[in-house]
Amino acid sequence: MKTDNNYVRSGRERLVDDNYQTIDPRCILALTSLIKITNAVDVCSPNGSGIVDELQEKGIPACGISDAFEEIVSGDWIVTNPPYQRSIVDKIVNRQIERVESGQVKGLAILVRTQFDHAKTRWGMFAANTSYAGQIKMLFRPKWFEDGESTPIHNYVWHIWGEYKIVGYPARIWYWKEH
């Protein structure tokens, strides 16, 4: 019996700290074509990250830091692709949502797998959060490696919090009652 599910496993070794750089320019295009970002910080990568490089290429001032829990960040928007490790990803996202709610930044955009918001434990990030603005579903699978040897196996979405509201699109409702 086969025990390795190809839908879950890519066949590649995991990168240290899940440091998958967002090198596919379509990801940033999907975000910036709908939301005006004046300047940004990527809290999960130092300068030279894929997100920082792509934003700068579009003429948007951007920088990166490697500590998502730093006290102060400099930028109107946080734009990031957090690591996938369950033990840390929710802490990182919740810390960035706190920055939005306190007014330290105008907005937050996180790039995560489409099913990220399906977890009951994340209900507070989305349905119960008035700063949650919506999502941008990308109708392509981002490429994470320059070699072109592998096809991505997961769909991705930008989740948005902050002053920007995505209007003219269907509302998302999270239903979690079991009875």
PLM regions and their residue ranges:
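Class I S-adenosyl-L-methionine-dependent methyltransferase catalytic core
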Residues: 1-179
